[in-house]
UniProtKB/Swiss-Prot annotation:
One Gene Ontology cellular component: cytoskeleton
PANTHER family noted in UniProt: THYMOSIN BETA (PTHR12021), THYMOSIN BETA-4-LIKE (PTHR12021:SF3)
Region (Disordered): 1-44
Sequence similarity: Belongs to the thymosin beta family.
GO-annotated biological processes: actin filament organization; regulation of cell migration
Chief localisation class: cytoplasm
Protein name: Thymosin beta-12
Pfam families named in the record: Thymosin (PF01290)
Organism ancestry: Eukaryota, Metazoa, Chordata, Craniata, Vertebrata
Superkingdom assignment: Eukaryota
Length: 44
């Protein structure tokens, strides 16, 4: 085991093999309007 990582694989990596994916937020943050509505509903 050497201390230095083996970068030969990294340098020969083919980016064209990667697939483009659409990222989707799992827990999107609520908008300011939604927060205001929830605050108003909680106080009434």
């Amino acid at each position: 085991m050497s201390d230095k990582p083996d970068i030969s694989e990294v340098t020969s990596f083919d980016k064209t093999k990667l697939k483009k994916t659409e990222t989707q937020e799992k827990n999107p943050l609520p908008s300011k309007e939604t927060i205001e509505q929830e605050k108003a509903a909680a106080t009434s």
